[in-house]
């Protein structure tokens, strides 16, 4: 049985998003079955009335525009992506922005235009085990007893499934 895949919302309602692809990724546009390109490096996505324009760092023209841009690693687990200025601790006293890295696919999805203008969401499509590893390492201290870390993994896996 294949490992379950999860769609985890990372960023909601942004006009612009800066990110870095560490490794090579296939770029699929608007649910196309075949990749449009192989990409890596630094990028900027800007949401407008025609969808999401994808700009290579320093470029004068966007590479392409689409309603959904899926960046899928050529080899799962060997490449990651870094999102700049991600807000963590939303609505808590410790809310702040930081740059965070993720394994799996990055999906940039245009929302329906509203009075707030064109916006996009960033979604991480990732395998269950990679997700659990990231959750446990982000929520628990490395100094926790092994039994506590194992219990957290069992609880998290049970909750997801």
PLM regions and their residue ranges:
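Conserved, single-site charged/polar hotspot
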Residues: 1-161
């Amino acid at each position: 049985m294949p490992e379950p895949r999860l769609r985890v919302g990372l960023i909601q309602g942004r006009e612009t998003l800066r990110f870095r692809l560490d490794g090579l990724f296939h770029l699929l546009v608007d649910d196309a079955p075949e990749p449009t390109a192989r990409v890596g490096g630094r990028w900027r996505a800007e949401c407008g009335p025609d969808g999401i324009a994808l700009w290579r760092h320093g470029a004068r023209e966007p590479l392409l525009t689409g309603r959904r841009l899926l960046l899928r690693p050529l080899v799962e687990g060997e490449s990651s992506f870094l999102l700049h200025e991600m807000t963590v601790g939303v609505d808590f006293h410790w809310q702040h922005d930081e740059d965070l890295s993720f394994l799996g696919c990055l999906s940039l999805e245009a929302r329906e235009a509203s009075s707030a203008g064109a916006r996009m969401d960033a979604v991480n499509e990732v395998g269950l085990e990679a997700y659990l590893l990231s959750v446990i390492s982000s929520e628990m201290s490395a100094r926790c007893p092994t039994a506590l870390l194992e219990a957290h993994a069992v609880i998290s896996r049970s909750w997801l499934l």
